[in-house]
Regions:
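Glycan-recognition and catalytic cores of secretory/periplasmic carbohydrate-active enzymes
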Residues: 1-397
Length: 397
């Protein structure tokens, strides 16, 4: 990758983050009256719904803390990180069991709790960045405590009817992959001592049960022993999810200087990019079938924003770690398609949901699932990766 291209991409990612995406959410997503963050926004940032997804109280707080700790000590970023943590402290925990809600109303009154504890994973990394920024020990302790709730609830969903009966028990890749990135974040922010053990356990689970070299696939849902169920749910692949998991594993390989982990992460990317790339219209398909049979999910051929964010990260990570030209080409391919179709030139930020041909399906900028996370994380990480590539190139010449 030549110097001019690196500098051009840094400008796209850095300026997109600091001058477009972050300002959009700072203008429209801060609830200065009731606290916390509002994410259900129309194309122009106007409010569509005042209910608050708890995932984004944690995710946006994490982003603001991450930027404060690692980009620039802007007081506004720290104050708004505190703003989000304060709302979570006051409204997002169920006092009956210590778990977090999934959805609250504008005032913070609970609406819904889910079986799986992903609100907790995002809150944990937010508390971690807050602790690092402020030096407040209670926040570091709370971050680890919430992480442990996340682990325990996902291993043993107390108080909830199991998702699957014993007729065909199954498990998804979501828990171990989110355990990896959450533990990595907390290792970095608060030096959490149990991080490596959970990362080891989670990577082992994924490579043993979900990673299938004989099929050249990463399976989303498997039996408890890694069996593949030849049914709709068992054959359904989620390329974006698997590619996101791939860069988590690459990142751990980089941290440990472990080439075997890097190799596994790159292999996951190769398989799932090949399966997920739409050869007719371009872009990453949301779901595909392991045997190339029809998929039951009616949104299977839509182009969501976040698989493209994760593939942009993963391909650039693979290029940094291997230097292989195919990953530079892969990154260029997905970057070009995404940046031609998702950005809104008039109002800023990205559309989230496109039809298969890349036309806009719905113009909103945020909802329960889309908010300030995948896109700004992609911009921030790719900015860093490109600076690392720049440095690597300079030392090799």
């Amino acid at each position: 990758m030549d110097l001019k291209k690196i500098e051009r991409l840094i400008k796209i990612y850095r300026d997109g983050l600091l001058n477009d995406v972050l300002p959009f959410w700072l203008r429209h997503g801060i609830d200065r009256e009731k606290g916390g963050f509002l994410t259900c926004l129309n194309r122009d940032g106007s409010l569509l719904d005042t209910d608050k997804p708890v995932w984004f109280q944690g995710r946006f707080s994490w982003l603001l803390g991450e930027l404060y700790n690692n980009v620039e000590k802007r007081p506004e970023w720290l104050e708004l990180c505190k703003h989000g943590v304060r709302f979570m402290e006051q409204h997002c925990f169920d006092p009956s069991d210590g778990r977090m809600w999934f959805h609250v109303n504008r005032e913070g009154l609970p609406l819904r709790k889910r079986r799986y504890a992903f609100s907790e994973s995002f809150a944990a990394i937010a508390y971690g960045e807050y602790a690092k920024a402020t030096g407040e020990s209670w926040a570091a302790e709370k971050a680890q405590h919430i992480f442990e709730i996340f682990i325990n609830q996902n291993l043993d969903p107390k108080g909830f009817t199991p998702k699957y009966t014993n007729t065909r028990p199954a498990k998804g890749i979501g828990f171990p992959m989110i355990a990896i990135i959450t533990a990595q974040e907390l290792r970095g922010s608060i030096g959490m001592q149990i991080s490596n053990a959970w990362i080891d356990r989670s990577i082992e689970t994924i490579l043993r049960d979900h990673y299938k070299p004989e099929l050249k696939a990463v399976i989303e849902t498997v039996g408890l022993g890694g069996e593949i169920y030849d049914h709709f749910d068992g054959r359904m692949l989620n390329p974006g999810h698997a590619i996101e998991c791939a860069w988590f594993i690459m990142q751990e390989g980089q941290y440990r200087n472990n080439n075997e982990l890097i190799k596994h992460g790159c292999q996951m990317l190769d398989w799932m990019f090949e399966r997920g790339w739409d050869k007719q219209f371009g872009g990453i398909l949301y779901n595909v079938d392991l045997k190339d049979l029809p998929v039951q999910e009616y949104w299977h051929d839509m182009k969501f924003w976040w698989p493209h964010n994760e593939t942009i990260i993963a391909s650039l990570y693979a290029y940094l770690l291997t230097g292989e030209e195919k990953y530079e080409k892969m990154h260029q391919q997905v970057h070009d398609w995404a940046y031609q179709h998702f950005p809104d030139a008039k109002f800023g930020e990205w559309y989230g949901y496109l039809h298969r041909d890349g036309s806009v399906s719905v113009p909103l900028k945020g909802n329960t699932w889309k908010g300030p996370f995948h896109l700004p994380r992609q911009q921030l990480i790719c900015w860093r990766l490109l600076e690392a590539i720049q440095k690597k190139n300079a030392t090799s010449t």
